[in-house]
């Protein structure tokens, strides 16, 4: 009798252990780990944290049932019949070598299925090279260096328009102003951070300007994180270009604007690449000093109201509680990439990387958080549906000025001089 | 001509600010042979103090720099008491590594509490005010910061060279044991030196809030330039730090404008290497 009781007790224990191990194994298998690799420290940390929050917001939409949101995968819970997306964060500090080693760590040790990253083009380049060698998927939201999709990579996919596309758009806008408003813009200055992103943006600016007959009178690279930008702004002021194209991230952007105010100089028009211009946190600190600058954007609250209402719902429900601000043009694109990847996985019906890559390369994906409404990748990974508009900021509100189809406000041209503000 | 004058003035104003940041480091390095790797983070902390005093209490950095100076004096003393004192005389790299750890702690603490957001005070008394001299535009916040820096530096020079306390500091720097035999409390001297070093960088950081955005990485390049200035000017020499800093400010400004903006730091470090090769103890070292 005692032996039977003891045997029964032991058998029950073993059965419970097996069931727990089994359910743990089942639970472990029901997650898809996605790495997010962004600058969480360093000069671009504000933007990096926003990018992570955007991906987390997208993960919440995918993982939970959201009947109120009309976006792909929002109405169901998880993908592949209940798999949840688990985000694994990593910080590349804005350094290419750290990006490379963190990508290796994410793929090899954390065993992530794919990586979304890296904001800085200089970090995206080596990290995506790691992915390509490992035959793993790399999704890039907002890194804008055109060179990234000119490498012929199979596993790399990028959402944002390139600096080449934006440069063409900036020049088209200048030509429009010259023709319709008799703007008389003939000379151009370019100021840019001395990194992969900045140098490439400057090269594209040069190409686009020379095609349009604009003369480049100042080419001013600077070291990001500089203690001052006095020499740089003095060089611009001495050359006095009609227009300035800027590629300065975060704090450097605010330092540049404040230094121009200090020396009392402004060009007639300033157009900015994917930079501090697009960051609401930077514009909040600049206040009215930031007014009348322009830049390329794939998102603004005003655009979203008109063209992307579901993005506003996602923003209010999952993004703003984390970031204390609306989406910005950069971070939202990182969120888009998780949606696109999740849709591709769902269509593949499995976690077969090659199958998913084939789907990413050939299919078109609806995207509630993309201005064009869809995402489709060319060979090389560039989003053929990438769209950005030119906005002008006034009182921390971005108003769309070009293309004319999206125009919502009349631009202030030329920029109001400092003394008259 | 106005370009030349502008570049000259920019260089001098930057140099004076660099001098104040570097002066405390020079004193500490000269007296105790200790490199404070957290010096840039002390600057960052001072800027945050004045930013938050301005943002929450509405007190302009023109006045709140005093609070930053006092806070950083206390932080400097605490750093000595808690970290440096326990690592001096142990392994050669112990104080260096300890201050490196402190720098990581301060930076990550501020990153965690205040986020990496760039924070810029607006509506300050001197905001955006400039005046013109001979065609050169002078920013009032930068000018006032430079003047304050010069006053503090001159006060420090007077303290070190003309007071009994200053002679005690110099004696401790020259020979600690001999100074103790002369009845100098070297323990208190070390404590004071760390405190003064903190106060100098606290004043600098506090005033910089009038025109520079504060974020957790703001101190990094200032710290590096401070090391260059200390090595160039000579360890322990405040006068050397002042002259070296102005030289660095001018080299940065002239190279940045007349050669190319992107080479300004190349020129700074090149000058440093040349001087060190010719005179390893720096221009005025003890």
Q: Where in the sequence are the language-model features?
A:
Chain A
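N-terminal signal peptide c-region/cleavage motif recognized by signal peptidases
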Residues: 22-24
């Amino acid at each position: 009798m005692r032996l039977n009781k003891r045997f029964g007790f032991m058998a029950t224990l073993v059965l419970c252990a097996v069931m727990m191990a089994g359910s743990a194994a089942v639970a472990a298998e029901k997650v898809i780990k996605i790495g997010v690799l962004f600058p969480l420290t360093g000069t671009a940390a504000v933007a990096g944290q926003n990018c992570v929050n955007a991906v987390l917001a997208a993960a919440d939409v995918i993982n939970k049932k959201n009947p109120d949101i009309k976006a792909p995968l929002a109405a169901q819970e998880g993908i592949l019949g209940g798999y949840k997306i688990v985000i694994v964060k990593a910080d590349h500090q804005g350094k290419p070598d750290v990006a490379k080693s963190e990508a290796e760590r994410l793929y090899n040790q954390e065993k992530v299925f794919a990586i979304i990253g890296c904001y800085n083009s200089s970090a995206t380049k080596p990290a995506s090279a790691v992915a390509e060698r490992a035959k793993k998927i790399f999704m890039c939201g907002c890194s804008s260096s055109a060179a990234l999709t000119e490498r012929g990579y199979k596993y790399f996919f990028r959402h944002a328009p390139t600096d080449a596309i934006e440069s063409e758009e900036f020049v088209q806008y200048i030509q429009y102003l010259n023709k319709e408003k008799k703007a008389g813009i003939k000379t151009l200055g370019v100021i840019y951070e001395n990194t992969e992103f900045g140098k490439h943006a400057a090269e594209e600016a040069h190409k686009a300007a020379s095609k349009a007959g604009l003369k480049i009178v100042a080419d001013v690279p600077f070291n990001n994180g500089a203690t001052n930008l006095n020499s740089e702004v003095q060089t611009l002021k001495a050359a006095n270009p009609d227009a300035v194209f800027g590629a300065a991230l975060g704090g450097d952007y605010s330092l540049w604007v404040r230094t121009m105010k200090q020396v009392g100089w402004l060009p007639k028009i300033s157009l900015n690449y994917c930079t501090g211009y697009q960051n609401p946190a930077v514009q909040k600190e600049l206040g009215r000093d930031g007014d009348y600058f322009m830049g390329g954007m794939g998102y603004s609250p005003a655009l979203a109201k008109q063209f992307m209402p579901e993005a506003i719902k996602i923003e209010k429900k999952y993004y703003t509680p984390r970031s204390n601000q609306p989406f910005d043009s950069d971070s939202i694109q990182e969120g888009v990439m998780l949606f696109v990847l999740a849709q591709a996985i769902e269509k593949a019906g499995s976690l077969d990387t090659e199958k998913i890559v084939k789907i990413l390369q050939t299919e078109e994906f609806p995207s509630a958080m993309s201005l064009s409404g869809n995402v489709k990748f060319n060979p090389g990974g560039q989003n053929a549906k990438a769209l950005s508009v030119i906005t002008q900021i006034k009182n921390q509100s971005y108003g769309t000025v070009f293309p004319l189809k999206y125009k919502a406000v009349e631009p202030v041209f030329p920029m109001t001089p400092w003394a008259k503000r | 001509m106005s370009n030349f004058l502008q570049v000259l003035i920019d260089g001098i104003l930057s140099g004076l600010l660099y001098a104040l940041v570097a002066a405390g480091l020079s004193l500490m390095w000269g007296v105790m042979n200790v490199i404070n790797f957290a010096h840039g983070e002390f600057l960052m902390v001072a800027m945050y103090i004045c930013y938050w005093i301005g943002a929450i209490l509405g007190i302009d950095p023109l006045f709140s720099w005093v609070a930053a100076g006092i806070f950083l004096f206390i932080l400097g003393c605490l750093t000595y008491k808690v970290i440096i004192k326990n690592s001096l005389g142990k392994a050669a790299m112990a104080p260096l590594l300890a201050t490196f750890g402190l720098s990581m702690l301060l930076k990550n603490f501020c990153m965690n509490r205040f986020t990496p957001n760039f924070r810029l005070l607006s509506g300050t008394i001197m905001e955006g005010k400039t005046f013109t001299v001979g065609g050169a535009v002078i920013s009032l916040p930068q000018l006032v910061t430079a003047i304050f820096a010069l006053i503090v530096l001159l006060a420090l020079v007077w303290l070190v060279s003309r007071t009994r306390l200053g002679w005690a500091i110099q004696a401790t720097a020259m020979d600690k044991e001999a100074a103790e035999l002369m009845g100098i409390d070297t323990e208190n001297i070390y404590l004071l030196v760390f405190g003064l070093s903190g106060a100098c960088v606290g004043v600098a950081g506090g005033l910089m809030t009038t025109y520079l955005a504060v974020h957790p990485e703001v101190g990094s390049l200032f710290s590096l330039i401070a090391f260059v200035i200390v090595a160039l000017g000579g360890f322990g020499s405040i006068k050397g730090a002042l002259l070296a800093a102005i030289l660095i400010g001018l080299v940065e400004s002239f190279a940045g404008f007349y050669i190319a903006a992107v080479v300004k730091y190349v020129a700074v470090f090149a000058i440093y290497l040349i001087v060190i090769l010719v005179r390893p103890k720096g221009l005025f070292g003890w």
